[in-house]
A protein has these predicted regions:
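Short helix-coil boundary/hinge micro-motifs
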Residues: 14, 19-47
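Short alpha-helix plus adjacent loop in nuclease-associated cores
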Residues: 245-266
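Acidic/histidine-rich catalytic cores and adjacent linkers
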Residues: 49, 54, 60, 147, ...
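Short Cys/His-rich Zn2+-coordinating modules
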Residues: 27-40, 66-80
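Short, positively charged, Gly/Tyr-enriched micro-motifs
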Residues: 56, 69-163, 167-174, 211-214, ...
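Short metal-coordination and nucleic-acid-contact micro-motifs, chiefly zinc-binding Cys/His arrays
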Residues: 45-49, 84-87
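Single conserved hydrophobic/aromatic residue that forms the stacking wall/gate
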Residues: 1-12
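Glycine-rich phosphate-binding "P-loop"
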Residues: 103-110, 181-195
Length: 427
């Protein structure tokens, strides 16, 4: 079904020009057609014949080209396209033909500049390329071509004094490496793999003098990074992420609780209570609520502290490991490195092998953990960046091409902060 608008060309042509933000005075609007799925704006491009670019003679108006179908931004919530008839000119001296040109679209192009600008704007957001194409009524290939217009030029003459290292999943079973400037959150590099060879080859492209400027590197408890970081950045201190240190202790406590819980009969009260209230054992004891509620498992009103006392009364082993765990948390959160490691050394032979494993790891990485307690740096900012990367990946239902994925990361995370690092191709 097609409906045509009744309008005065003198008034509406001017209004439509303002509405569409078209500044070319040589475009004249003729009609608007409202179709079921979109709007079509009929227009023509015409102006006085120019001189011939070949011989310099005066050209003459010849005819109009077949209408170009130019996609445009939505109007009144409907996809819109302009059917633009362009004047052709002919030189009767050398037979040169030329088509009229307009500022709204490049020569020999069909996608207008305003749509290209909108694509670039949406690429900065976390929208998938398929959704961008659907929203702007263009092909996905057009969006990918615009993505490829962005060029990231790594600056091998500079590295920040403080940077963060981490990894993220690019495809199933394959981890990639990412490094970020701790202060301004700009991405330094994204590498397809996280092997020592890949990371070493990348950072060796920086001069040693540049690498010696790095003072701090924050990272997870991933041992292959330790020696590599010291080789590449001889002046850098390694700071382990505090969250992952606490996570190691928490997991050891959780596994210990499960082992003790499984010693009880599955239908016993002890088993059910230990399983149901597992969070109270994991929680920092200083944050336990003192509000009293009716607890169906115990058939009485109890506070969280009273429930915890009952759980710990079921097993001396559980009580001992819980007390060690809580003391470790206390010293760690108060940044008391000497007391933290003193407690580990005093108890390493008295605890379950589950705790012994993490205690040995902590003692081996003592210097890096002390740095984490003494210095105000962590991997929290990079973990937040990784969440944004996961969002980009999830919205796109995954990426097959690593370079496209890498560009989306740089565009989304760097371009708002430092546009000088990007060159938008004008070709």
């Amino acid at each position: 079904e097609i409906s045509r608008s009744d309008w005065s060309s003198d008034v509406c042509s001017s209004d439509l020009t303002k509405l569409l933000d078209i500044k070319d005075p040589n475009i004249q609007f003729i009609d608007i057609i409202n179709r079921d799925t979109h709007k079509e704006i009929i227009a023509k491009l015409d102006y006085n014949a120019p001189s011939c670019p070949e011989c310099g003679s005066q050209m003459k108006k010849y005819d109009f080209q077949k209408p170009s179908k130019i996609p445009y931004l939505e109007t009144t919530g409907m996809p819109t396209r302009i059917l633009l008839k362009k004047r052709r000119f002919k030189c009767y001296h050398c037979s040169k033909m030329m088509v009229a040109e307009t500022s709204i679209v490049k020569k020999n192009h069909q996608i207008p500049r305003i749509i290209n600008q909108k694509i670039a704007q949406k690429l900065i957001e976390k929208t998938s390329m398929t959704d961008i194409a659907h929203q702007l009524a263009i092909s996905t290939s057009t969006v990918i071509r615009k993505l490829n217009d962005f060029r990231f030029k790594p600056d091998f003459s500079y590295l920040p004094e403080i940077m963060s290292w981490d990894e993220y999943a690019f495809t199933k079973g394959k981890m990639s490496f990412i490094a970020q400037n701790f202060d301004n959150l700009n991405i330094i590099t994204v590498l397809e793999g996280r092997t020592q060879a890949i990371i070493r080859n990348h950072f060796l492209r920086y001069d040693r003098a540049v690498r010696c400027q790095v003072k701090i590197i924050t990272m997870d408890m991933f041992s292959p990074y330790y020696d590599l970081a010291k080789q590449l950045f001889p002046n850098a201190k390694i700071v382990l992420d505090r969250f992952h240190i606490v996570q190691h202790m928490s997991r050891a406590m959780s596994r210990m609780r499960v082992q003790i819980m499984n010693q009880f009969h599955r239908k016993s009260h002890e088993y059910k209570a230990t399983k149901r209230y597992w969070k109270l054992i994991q929680q920092d004891s200083r944050k336990l609520s003192d509000k009293r509620f009716y607890r169906p498992t115990f058939r009485m009103h109890l506070t969280n502290k009273e429930i915890l006392d009952k759980l710990l009364s079921y097993s001396e082993d559980l009580k001992h490991h819980y007390n060690v765990y809580q003391l470790l948390l206390f010293h760690f959160q108060n940044k008391e490195a000497d007391k933290f490691f003193g407690l580990i050394e005093d108890n390493i032979k008295l605890v379950h092998p589950l705790f012994q494993t993490i205690f040995k790891t902590f003692l081996k990485d003592k210097e890096k953990i002390v740095n984490a307690l003494q210095l105000p740096y962590s991997n929290a900012k990079l973990e937040a960046t990784n969440n944004l990367i996961k969002l980009i990946k999830r919205n796109a239902f995954g990426f097959r091409n690593f370079e496209n994925f890498k560009k989306r990361i740089f565009i989304a995370l760097n371009i708002k902060k430092e546009r000088t690092n990007f060159v938008l191709s004008r070709s």
